[in-house]
Regions:
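A surface-exposed beta-strand-loop module
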Residues: 1-39, 101
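Hydrophobic residues embedded in beta-strands of well-ordered beta-sheets
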Residues: 7, 43-45, 83, 100
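Compositionally biased, intrinsically disordered/low-complexity regions enriched for serine, proline
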Residues: 9-12, 42, 58, 89
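Hydrophobic helix-coil surface modules that form long, contiguous segments used
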Residues: 50-54, 62-199
Length: 199
């Protein structure tokens, strides 16, 4: 697999901004594509990223090293029945219409850039935390994580304000092959953590 290639930009002066137009291959190692049969609801396909360790470069043109931290904005178009989320400012009240805009104001390393798309719905836990999941898992997930705000407040009492502003959780389909990934603003979780006893 190609794990990066040089991008040379020749400009007469030092521009403050450069726009790069690119397309990503469906075979990108940092993207996983699930057929509807591999999801909980079995109605819509699902896509998620796993950029850790050096797979962000397979779907986004960037310097894929933890030593480079950046903010980002993104505009994502999808089929209208699919909800798209990123490790950014996901709007819990966003309309599922196939047109999504994101902004990540805090600097992150490349392996924490994340995207997911599928039959996703949201339920609020607190003003700054909630759960995204397929509809069939939502109530169970919210019950499992209903103490999240108390945990955030306890951590803040020990270590100071939570730096990402929101802590939302995304419960992925049963075929998600990882335990989870602590992406800023949108932690990816395996559904196997939902056992009914809040552990």
């Amino acid at each position: 697999p190609i794990l990066g290639s040089k991008l040379t930009i020749e400009a007469p002066e030092h521009p403050s901004q450069v726009r790069v137009t690119y397309s990503t291959s469906p075979d990108a190692s940092g993207l996983q594509w699930l057929e509807p049969s591999m999801t909980e609801g079995k109605q819509l396909p699902f896509m998620f990223s796993q950029s850790q360790q050096i797979h962000a470069r397979s779907w986004v043109p960037l310097q894929d090293t933890p030593s480079v931290r950046y903010t980002y904005s993104a505009h994502v178009s999808s089929r209208p029945d699919v909800m798209v989320l990123m490790s950014a400012d996901n709007d819990p009240s966003a309309i599922r219409d196939g047109d999504y805009t994101f902004k990540m104001p805090q600097r992150i390393p490349s392996y924490l850039m994340a995207i997911a798309a599928g039959d996703l719905v949201f339920k609020r836990i607190s003003d700054r935390s909630g759960v995204w999941s397929e509809p069939a898992m939502l109530d169970k997930a919210v019950k499992e994580f209903e103490d999240t705000e108390r945990m955030i407040a306890t951590a803040e009492s020990l270590y100071g304000p939570y730096r990402w502003d929101r802590y939302d959780m995304l419960v992925l389909p049963p075929s998600f092959p990882y335990g989870g990934m602590e992406n800023p603003r949108l932690t990816f979780l395996t559904p196997t953590v939902i056992v009914g006893d809040k552990t």
